[in-house]
Each structure stands twice: as C-alpha cells, then as structure tokens.
Amino acid sequence: MTGMDAVPESHSGWTFLTNHARVLASVADDPNVRIRDIAARCRLTERAVQRIIADLEQAGYLSHTREGRANAYRVIPGKVLRHPAEASLTVGSLLALLARDEVDHTPRTADNR
C-alpha cells in the first residue's frame, strides 16, 4: 500500500451496505474514532471518509465537537433513514441491527462452541 489515501483491498460490483452505513456504524462504535481508523476499518480512503462524514453531518445524522486536536462524534439515533421505503426506520434501529449482526458473527473458539 502506498500513500496515506491508499485503500487496503479493492473490490468491484455492488455491496449490501453503503459506505455511508459503514462509516456511521464505525462512528457509533467509537465516538472518538479517528478518520484514519474509520478508513482502515471500512477499506476507504481518508478523503472518502471525510466526504461521507460531511454528508452525514449535513443531513443531520451525526454531529461533531472538537476536543483538543481530535473530534468527538455524536450519532443522532432518532433520525429516520432517507429512502422512502425505510422512512419508518431510524438510524438507531439500523445500528442495532448491524451491532447484533456483528455479535452473531464473532469467530468461535473451542471455548465458546
């Protein structure tokens, strides 16, 4: 990987979750997360993460405050999703679904089978 904005792995085609959903979930998991860490987790460039965070803030899905040299993010869980077919669902319900899925897919070891 070369350069700060290099993406660790590329993929082609469509995915079930949007990059916006992935970034929002990362921020919800750790409100003090750095853009660099979001980029690595979501396999995006830092520049793409910055644009997505700006989109999410502009649409009212999250906000941030400066804490020294870092940002602290706040997800707005009661905000409804954008697509008309999902207008009855909130950000909080989406994040709960993603968090539950993450727990369900925890790698099993000999101790937790």
Task: Locate the predicted segments by residue.
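Short, cationic-aromatic polyanion-contact patches
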Residues: 9-20, 34, 66-89
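A short, conserved structural fragment
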Residues: 57-67
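Alpha-helical DNA-recognition elements
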Residues: 51, 55
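Central "turn" residue of the DNA-binding helix-turn-helix
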Residues: 31-32, 43
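Alpha-helical residues within the helix-turn-helix
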Residues: 37-40, 57-58
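Amphipathic alpha-helical dimerization/coiled-coil segments
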Residues: 1-8, 80-113
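Pre-recognition alpha-helix immediately N-terminal to the DNA-recognition helix
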Residues: 21-26
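Key DNA-contact positions within bacterial/archaeal DNA-binding proteins
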Residues: 47
